[in-house]
Regions:
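Conserved GNAT acetyl-CoA-binding A-motif
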Residues: 120-122, 149-162
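Conserved acyl-donor/pantetheine-binding loop and adjacent beta-alpha core of acyl/acetyltransferases
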Residues: 68, 73-128, 134, 184-188
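Conserved active-site alpha-helix within GNAT-family acetyltransferase domains
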Residues: 140, 152-154, 163-180, 186-187
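A short beta-loop-alpha structural element at the N-terminal edge
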Residues: 2-16, 20, 24
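Conserved acetyl-CoA-binding loop-helix of GNAT-fold acetyltransferases
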Residues: 129, 135-148, 172
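A short helix-loop-beta-strand connector motif used in the catalytic cores of GNAT acetyltransferases and
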Residues: 41-61, 117-123
């Protein structure tokens, strides 16, 4: 298995893998409670996200025999908050993809932005492994690949876990829970996790 930077030629396979990986994700189930709608909308959701990634920091894919087994979507320091003009330009397409679920998605996005740390960091906006390959080390290899860079650059990393069962996985890679967030309106709870670079001092996370 090889971990390498995401390329445009990987788009279709990576979108399909992430859509399968996030089909039962609590946040995605909250935004798209209808299973058929969720399976229709997730591919376009991830396609839109990935198209903007190369200029926003980079994604990495785990590949074996030409098959994308998993992907990690990262945003470089400062890139987690898109400029207002980009949000305005993207709004019509976002509204089209989300339809009647736009309010739920907007509530979720707004809640996440309000608690996002301001201190420079790499942001893991999503990581997913094709369900048949989960538990085989794909996710760990993807995570380690970028965390090595974080350590070399002396930069922290941040993520939100929407599943409490995944918290120990991230803790094994040096992340610590620094807070919990319940999405307003009856949405799921997310665990906010921070990782200082290896061998670096523990520092208070600046919100």
């Amino acid at each position: 298995m090889t971990i390498r930077p995401f390329a445009r030629a990987d788009l279709s396979a990576t979108v399909a893998t992430l859509a399968r990986a996030f089909d039962q994700d609590p946040v995605m189930m909250w935004i798209f409670p209808d299973e058929r709608m969720r399976r229709r909308r997730l591919p376009s959701f991830f396609a839109s996200s990935l198209r903007g990634i190369p200029r926003a920091g980079g994604a990495e894919v785990a590949v074996l025999g030409g098959r994308v087994l998993g992907a990690a979507v990262w945003l470089a320091p400062g890139a987690w908050r898109p400029p207002l003009w980009r949000q305005v330009v993207a709004l019509p397409g976002v509204a089209l993809r989300l339809g009647s679920r736009l309010p739920a998605a907007s509530t979720t996005y707004g809640a996440l932005l309000r608690v996002h740390p301001e201190r420079p960091h790499w942001y893991l906006s999503g990581i997913g492994t094709d369900p048949p390959m989960q538990g085989t080390g794909v996710g760990s290899d993807l995570l380690r690949s970028r965390l090595v860079r974080c350590d070399a650059d002396r930069l922290p990393a941040y993520l939100e876990s929407s599943n409490e069962r995944n918290v120990p996985f991230y803790e094994r890679h040096g992340f610590k829970v620094v807070g919990e967030l319940s999405i307003p309106g009856g949405g799921p709870t997310l665990w906010l996790m921070w990782r200082d670079p290896a061998d670096g001092p523990d520092q208070e996370v600046a919100q």
